[in-house]
């Protein structure tokens, strides 16, 4: 397998209808990462990602690159970058679904159909050279990272590790022959609006007698993260586009969560001492970095640490949640999920976290979507995954 870093070192320029379409050069990486901010000067909901985090995400430090090879392009007009895109092959996806599918991601561009055509033309041509006959996305870089194109909910800022976008993206992508694969939903709830009906409370009290809900054990953090991985892979294995998390990916994620998430915001549910479900409540880092313009220097580090550890943030996101497969369609499976959500209420109150995003949830997951609606949440953002035969 070719090292992704080597792909970044390739350079080539192709003229396309007055544009210059360029393979991403290693020296262009900074401009590639910074480009989206040029599209949002008047958008109060745009939050520039931290450059250091995006740089690591697009490097061999991202454990996803153990099984992903990828290429990236920028489109230039009059010497200025006007768009960007990636294309990638995920070997774990191919092992599970066959070798005919590749993916695209990190699509951002000005409101110009020629720019979109140039970028997607480059991505599709490269994927064809890798044996793909089908393309889906956007993924940055796979389904376990940032996924989906924002199509509803432009009027609010994204939570941590969720994408933003421009309203014109969908129309230009669909004009190129892409069609809906599936939608992902983000649900929003105020902590004080979290309510359980008498019927739900009765069910929860019955199941509570059989289930132990505990905080993660920080003394065994690495081992606990692998328990979470096993539960996630078990519970999500039948979902659309599922690709399993690797041990390396979850270990790296654990190294990050260890410093960002308090112990009492990661819960594991057990039945007869056997872990069966979990939930992770992540303080909304985007709230803490909104005014840092993507930089932690010279004083960004101090501001970020103060906001996360001292003053706190007022919103959070549940980026990871899972119930083992054997409980998915049982009577107690959904109730275990409710008990885990309930467990976050008190630690949120102690930290003055007022609101929570649950994301993302497949639109076809009617059980979870109905449950969230019943406890006071509302769907406030919708993201689309597209597909196309190439």
From Swiss-Prot:
Effects seen without this gene: Reduced formation of biofilm.
GO BP: any one term: single-species biofilm formation
Induction field: During biofilm formation.
Highest rank taxon of the organism: Bacteria
Miscellaneous comment as given in the Swiss-Prot or TrEMBL entry: May be missing up to 10 N-terminal residues compared to orthologs.
Name the record gives this protein: Protein YghO
Organism name: Escherichia coli (strain K12)
Gene designation: yghO
């Amino acid at each position: 397998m070719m090292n992704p870093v080597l792909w970044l070192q390739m350079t080539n320029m192709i003229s396309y209808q007055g544009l210059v379409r360029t393979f991403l050069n290693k020296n262009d990486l900074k401009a590639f990462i910074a480009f989206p901010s040029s599209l949002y000067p008047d958008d109060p909901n745009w939050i520039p990602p931290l450059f250091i985090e995006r740089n690591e995400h697009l490097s061999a430090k991202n454990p996803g690159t153990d099984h992903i090879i990828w290429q990236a392009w920028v489109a230039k007009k009059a010497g200025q970058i006007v768009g960007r895109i990636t294309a990638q092959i995920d070997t774990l996806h191919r092992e599970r679904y066959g070798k005919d599918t590749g993916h695209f991601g990190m699509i951002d561009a000005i409101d110009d159909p020629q720019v979109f055509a140039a970028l997607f033309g480059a991505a599709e041509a490269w994927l064809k050279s890798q044996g793909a006959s089908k393309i889906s996305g956007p993924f940055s870089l796979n389904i376990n990272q940032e996924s989906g194109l924002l199509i509803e909910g432009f009027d609010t800022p994204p939570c941590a590790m969720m994408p933003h976008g421009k309203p014109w993206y969908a129309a230009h992508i669909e004009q190129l022959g892409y069609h809906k694969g599936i939608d992902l939903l983000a649900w929003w709830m105020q902590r004080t609006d979290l309510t359980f009906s008498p019927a739900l409370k009765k069910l929860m009290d019955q199941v509570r007698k059989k289930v132990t809900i505990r905080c993660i054990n920080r003394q065994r953090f690495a081992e606990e993260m692998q328990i979470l991985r096993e539960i996630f892979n078990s519970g999500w294995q039948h979902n659309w586009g599922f690709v399993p998390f690797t041990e390396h990916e979850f270990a790296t994620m654990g190294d990050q969560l260890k410093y960002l998430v308090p112990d009492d915001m990661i819960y594991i549910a057990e039945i007869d001492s056997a872990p069966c479900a979990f939930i992770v409540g992540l303080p909304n880092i985007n709230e803490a970095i909104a005014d840092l313009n993507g930089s932690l220097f010279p004083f960004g580090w101090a501001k970020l640490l103060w906001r996360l550890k001292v003053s706190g943030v007022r919103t959070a996101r549940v980026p990871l949640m899972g119930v083992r497969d054997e409980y998915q369609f049982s009577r107690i499976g959904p109730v275990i999920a409710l008990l885990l959500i309930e467990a976050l209420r008190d630690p949120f109150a102690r930290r003055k976290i007022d609101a929570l995003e649950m994301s993302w949830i497949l639109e076809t997951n009617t059980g979870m979507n109905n449950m969230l609606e019943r406890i006071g949440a509302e769907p406030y953002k919708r993201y689309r995954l597209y597909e196309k035969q190439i």
